[in-house]
Amino acid sequence: MFITFEGGEGCGKTTQLTLLGDWLEKRCHRVVRTREPGGTALGRSLRGLLLDARSEITPTAELLLYATDRAEHLARVVRPALASGAAVLCDRFSDSTVAYQGYGRGLDLGLIERLNAIATGGLLPDLTFWLKLDPQAGLVRRLASNGNTPDRIEAETLAFHQRVHMGFAALANRYPGRIRPVDAGLSVEATAEQIRSAVDVFLNENQSKLEK
């Protein structure tokens, strides 16, 4: 089972991933928690470069760096974990590239789709939770949590983050079976309950397939 968490800045993805992982482990599932960028040694180096506020990276170079991280991450972490029978929970995946580099940066969506297909080998998540939050509220929340020191992406204009939000909305409309919008403006527990409920339904409906 492969579950990804998506959303804009400050939406609470990491918190919700941790809570779902804890819940699954209590139900006797083996869980691998990971993230993009940064799920491998190479990914951690790329993450530092991509998020460093001092980095000057062109949109196309940024896109290719994220694809590099994803290809390495799939080969070294995600696919081996899935093959071993673990549930993989990932903080950001290919949808973020569409939203940030496609809608946010304005790069060609067809190019991004082809690049994602190469990096992932066609692998898609079983479920994706889009933690839906007003971009301005998310930025305020995020900056309050990191000492008002934004990284390179957080420092982008509000208009950029609004375009990213539109990108996630477009993806949710395109893939309603996979992408589940979740109200991230609720309390942490209320948001977690929405996610647990959706995963519970998915597990009940797909138990036989997951056991193969």
UniProtKB/Swiss-Prot annotation:
One of its GO terms (molecular function) is dTMP kinase activity. The keyword Nucleotide-binding applies. One of its GO terms (biological process) is dTDP biosynthetic process. ATP binds at G7, G8, E9, G10, C11, G12, K13, T14. It comes from the Bacteria. Keywords: ATP-binding, Kinase, Nucleotide biosynthesis, Nucleotide-binding, Transferase. Its EC number is 2.7.4.9. It is an enzyme of class 2 (transferase). It catalyses: dTMP + ATP = dTDP + ADP. Belongs to the thymidylate kinase family. NCBIfam families: DTMP_kinase (TIGR00041). This is Thymidylate kinase. It comes from Gloeobacter violaceus (strain ATCC 29082 / PCC 7421). The lineage of its organism: Bacteria, Bacillati, Cyanobacteriota, Cyanophyceae, Gloeobacterales.
